[in-house]
Amino acid sequence: MKLLLENWRQYVLKEAYILDEDFFEASIQQLFEKLKDFGDNTWIFFDTETTGFKPESAQLTEIGAISAKPDNWQFTEVEAEQGMFYDKIKLNPETLAGFEASDDPDVKYPLELTRYGMPSDEYREKYPKGMPNEEDILKQFVSYLESQPNPVLVAQNAEFDVNFIQKRADLYNIPVNMRAYPIFDTMMLIKLWHNSLIKTLADSGDERAQTILQALTMTGKFGDYVSASMGPVSKAYEISTDDWHNALADVKMMMGMTKAIFMALQASSDVDISKYQGRTAWGLRKKKQGYHRSDK
């Protein structure tokens, strides 16, 4: 039974993700050819903020989303109130109790609680009876998704957000299958296509690519690496990172970053990126299934 469930999970994951493992080594032209199938969909860029990494013990504190039409991959926002979703979420009693029980003195500090969703003046005005709870916001977010025509879910390191929302919705018996929607992970776009292109162009002497590559090169405990994190990539394209880790600000940053990446890929769609892409694909396949919140 366990094997059957695991096989089912693998099938669902493969069907959900547009940039799945079988597509890791596709050329830039093949990428755009595949995306034509989703050119008339509504792309929903979304992001979550949480009190921790594990949905079994942590909760959502914000959900932000913006709906857009691809428009030759420059993403025109849906101009209507129903084209945007954003709300902060009241801390659950269990979450507050966890803060109180923590051995970390910084966790109990009031500013830490403010970071996790304590209401601003704006929200006191919006919710005079208090901020909404997690269950209510999840129900509203699910309704928002269902109201959009032919949605594609777009997120940076999408498995974290998809999994977190799914697990928290399951907790409240909210009927939703996040993986029933096509999912586009911008982190995979960066790792496999964008960064492979930038490295290839930098090797050929392209000064703009060399500048971007330099901006993305970080030093870690195992040496230098090229970041696929949303903040550094956005900064490399001079996209504002103000209020990074606010859900709605992150969504706007993600949209700007994705536009810039698609423009770069369109401008060099005939470049052979297989040298670096193949190495990245090999590394991704070697990793165990999972995800890392740090890629946000």
What feature does the model see in each segment?
Residues 23-166, 227-236:
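Conserved non-catalytic scaffold segment of RNase H-like nuclease domains
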